[in-house]
């Protein structure tokens, strides 16, 4: 294939779009589509090579993957190793962020990082900004495509050649009809949601929804392979100009990024525009000339290194500072991205790409040995220092661990007569309730199941402790296991309900789903408990804050100096999400008090310090949960205030 400098120029457009979007989403709202441009370019270049080699009988699967290893692996492993080494020093051992980085590295070396992301991360969620290897999802998708596409194309061409007469000129047309059908099917599959063990997969990362984008490039490559689909100068100018206008509009304007349209049929628009630019670039016209400028081409040549290095550096900056990055920090980070990318391109990517080693030696040095190094780094720092646990944990097990908390708190020699019930926002307050109960001289049962609230108690049947334990042990982490846990918890509650005089309900009242979906169930449960003569207290314990990074906590524990002036701004800490949540909390309080004026309301948010810090240490383990240290701090503040959670004579007024 003749070298096309304009295609390297288009690579430059793609990588700049992605980096600008990640620097600040407002700068280029559709910048995430740069990845889709990369997919089209890849499909065109590699798809074209595959088609020509299969057509001439010169294709070798071994040679194909040898080229892929030389092209992809050296810089890829350099970034993964760098990320694990830096992450081990910067991130809190055992924290969600560090565990996610390690797991992402593990999945990525097997080119399955997109599946890990699909199980855990919304691409557009704020939490992504501190996940340093999340961007490797696109590389995984591309490699998954090339694991199967050579075989699919070989099969398609073989079948068509058997059907058509020898030397038929219809081969190209027939191949493209099949590839087009596959591309349309890929986009259409976005209308079929997929879940694994009851967990919905994030469509953004799924390969079968992205293969259509690579196929658009491959379809163009097949169409032009015979040399009879070359544009005239006039056609090139028209198609190229129209395509660049469409692509600019997609990048500059807010682009739909939700299922089922993206990924899906909406992605076809920027992809077809990218293919149009590639098609038109076969003839010199104004934009092809601009893309072929030496400076633009050079950016395109180092685009792979730029893409690999930009996200870990930005993620570490977000993590270390725990706040929105200033323009000065962004500029410094951008400079570091360029410098590391240049070093990577000249010292790693290019020298190792051109070593003419055998397939076995290349696989050993480029893949197996680096994978063993990553495995060694993965095994390091797995345990959290004991002194860190109270800052990093909110008492809620991470991941999909089966958890049903049903534990005694408070004065242990008393009979439990208080039930504290809810989800993770109940579990996070275990130390708060335990310390307050001991100070007030009562004993209770704390029951929490992450993400759920007991409902339909009136329909539950009592269950013995033996039955409870047997059912619990047999619940497997498949299907709707969380609902099974909640149902089992409800049965346990109804069994013990007669001995409880007071019921305390603690949920994430600020969350939109709690307000829209869970509140009717809560009101129904309160009504049932009220009929049973129970004294009911509703607790609001936390909100959604703009920051709760653990970097400042980690530095404080290590006795390092930390500048937290940027965290002192109430406007920053308590942003849009906080104020919207505050409105939902007040609406919830009003809804409960309107129907059940005798229900008490205890708001712990006023006890949370303005800076979210106490003695220089964070009281939150993430933007929405109090850590163990914070729960003890709130208990001390509450006790010092002179208030009572369980007063000697239950009060009928709202706290």
Question: Which residues fall in each region the model found?
Answer:
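Membrane-interface helix/loop caps of multi-pass membrane proteins
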Residues: 1-357, 654
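Extracellular/periplasmic envelope-modification machinery, especially enzymes
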Residues: 256-258, 320-331, 335-342, 346, ...
């Amino acid at each position: 294939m003749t070298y096309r400098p304009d295609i390297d120029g288009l690579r430059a457009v793609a990588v700049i779009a992605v980096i600008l979007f990640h620097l600040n989403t407002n700068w280029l709202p559709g910048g995430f589509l740069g990845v889709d441009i990369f997919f089209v370019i890849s499909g065109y270049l590699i798809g074209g090579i595959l088609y020509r080699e299969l057509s001439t009988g010169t294709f070798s699967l071994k040679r194909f993957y040898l080229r892929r290893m030389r092209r992809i692996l050296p810089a890829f492993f350099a970034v993964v190793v760098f990320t694990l080494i830096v992450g081990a020093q910067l991130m809190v051992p055992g924290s969600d962020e560090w565990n996610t980085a390690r797991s992402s590295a593990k999945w990525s070396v097997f080119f399955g990082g997109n599946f890990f992301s699909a199980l855990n991360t919304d691409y557009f969620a704020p939490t992504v900004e501190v996940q340093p290897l999340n961007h490797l999802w696109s590389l995984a998708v591309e490699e998954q495509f090339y694991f199967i596409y050579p075989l699919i194309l070989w099969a398609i061409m073989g079948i068509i050649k058997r059907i058509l007469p020898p030397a038929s000129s219809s081969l190209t047309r027939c191949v493209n009809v099949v590839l087009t059908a596959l591309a349309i099917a890929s986009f259409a599959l976005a209308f079929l949601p997929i879940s694994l063990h009851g967990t919905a997969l994030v469509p953004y990362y799924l390969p079968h929804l992205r293969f259509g984008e690579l196929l658009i490039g491959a379809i163009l490559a097949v169409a032009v392979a015979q040399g009879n689909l070359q544009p005239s100068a006039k056609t090139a100018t028209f198609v190229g100009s129209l395509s660049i206008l469409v692509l600019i509009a997609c990048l500059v304007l807010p682009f739909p990024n939700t299922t089922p349209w993206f990924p899906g049929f909406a992605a076809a628009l920027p992809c077809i525009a990218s293919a149009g630019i590639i098609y038109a670039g076969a003839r010199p016209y104004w934009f092809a000339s601009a893309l072929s400028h030496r400076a633009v081409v050079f950016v395109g040549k180092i685009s792979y290194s730029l893409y690999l290095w930009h996200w870990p550096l930005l993620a570490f900056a977000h993590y270390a500072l725990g706040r929105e990055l200033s323009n000065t920090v962004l500029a410094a980070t951008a400079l570091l991205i360029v410098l590391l990318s240049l070093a990577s391109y000249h010292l790693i990517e290019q020298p190792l790409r051109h070593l003419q080693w055998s397939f076995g030696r290349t696989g050993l040095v480029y893949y197996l040995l680096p994978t063993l190094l990553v495995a060694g780094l993965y095994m390091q720092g797995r345990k959290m220092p004991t002194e860190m646990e109270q800052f990093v944990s909110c008492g809620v097990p991470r991941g999909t661990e089966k958890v049903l908390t049903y534990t005694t708190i408070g004065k242990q020699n008393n009979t439990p007569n208080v039930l504290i019930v809810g989800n993770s926002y109940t579990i996070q307050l275990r130390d708060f309730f335990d310390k307050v109960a001991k100070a007030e001289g009562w004993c209770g049962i704390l029951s929490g199941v992450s993400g759920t609230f007991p409902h339909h108690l009136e329909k539950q049947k009592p269950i013995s402790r033996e039955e409870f334990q047997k059912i619990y042990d047999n619940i497997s982490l498949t299907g709707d296991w969380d609902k099974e846990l909640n149902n089992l918890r409800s049965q346990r509650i109804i069994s013990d309900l007669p001995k409880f005089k007071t019921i305390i309900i603690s949920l994430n009242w600020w969350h939109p789903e709690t307000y829209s979906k869970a509140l009717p169930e809560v009101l129904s449960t309160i009504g049932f408990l009220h009929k049973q003569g129970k004294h009911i207290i509703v607790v609001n314990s936390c909100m959604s804050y703009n920051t709760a990074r653990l970097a400042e906590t980690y530095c404080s524990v290590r006795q390092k100096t930390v500048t937290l002036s940027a965290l002192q701004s109430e406007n920053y800490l308590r942003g849009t999400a906080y104020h919207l949540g505050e409105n939902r909390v007040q609406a919830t309080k009003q809804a409960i008090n309107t129907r059940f004026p005798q229900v008490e309301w205890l708001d712990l948010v006023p006890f949370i310090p303005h800076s979210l810090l106490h003695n220089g240490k964070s009281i939150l383990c993430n933007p929405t949960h109090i850590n163990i240290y914070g729960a003890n701090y709130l208990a001390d503040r509450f006790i010092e205030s002179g208030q009572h959670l369980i007063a000697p004579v239950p009060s009928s007024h709202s706290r």
